[in-house]
C-alpha cells in the first residue's frame, strides 16, 4: 500500500497532518448522503490510499476527503470522484485557492448504475 497523500494543502505542517489524521480516523459524512447538485464550500481536498476487505478480498482504494468551510469532512471511495478530485487538487494548487466550491454530480451509467463525480464551480 502506498502512503502518498495528494492534497490542496501542505501535509507536512501540523495543521495539514491533523486534517489527514482526522479524515482517516473519523471519516466524516459520506458523499453518498449528498443530493445531486449539492454545492460544498471547501477549504481543502485530500486523497490517500486505504486497504479494504471486500468479502475476503483485500484491495487498495483511493479515499477522497473534502474539508468544508464549517469544519466538516465529506469522504468518498469512488473511482470517478477520485479522478475528478485529482484534477481539482491540481487546479486549486496551481491557482493558490484558499477556498473553492465543489458541486456533487450524481449520474447513471449506461447500465443503470449510479455514480458520483465532482465539479469545480465558481
From Swiss-Prot:
Give a yes or no for keyword DNA-binding in this entry.
Answer: yes
Pfam families to which the protein is assigned, alphabetical? Phi29_Phage_SSB (PF17427)
**Superkingdom as given in the UniProt entry:** Viruses
GO MF, one term, reads: DNA binding
Q: Which BP terms in the Gene Ontology apply to this protein?
A: DNA replication; viral DNA genome replication
Keywords, in A-Z order: DNA replication, DNA-binding, Early protein, Viral DNA replication
Question: How does this protein assemble?
Answer: Monomer.
- Biological role stated in the UniProt entry: Single-stranded DNA binding protein required for the elongation during viral DNA replication by strand displacement. Displaced viral DNA strands are transiently coated with the ssDNA-binding protein and therefore protected againt nucleases. The latter is then probably removed by the replisome that performs lagging strand synthesis or during the events that lead up to the recombination process. Has helix-destabilizing activity since it removes secondary structure from the ssDNA in replicative intermediates.
Its family remark reads: Belongs to the phi29likevirus single-strand-binding protein family.
Protein name stated in the entry:
Single-stranded DNA-binding protein
Q: Which gene encodes it?
A: 5
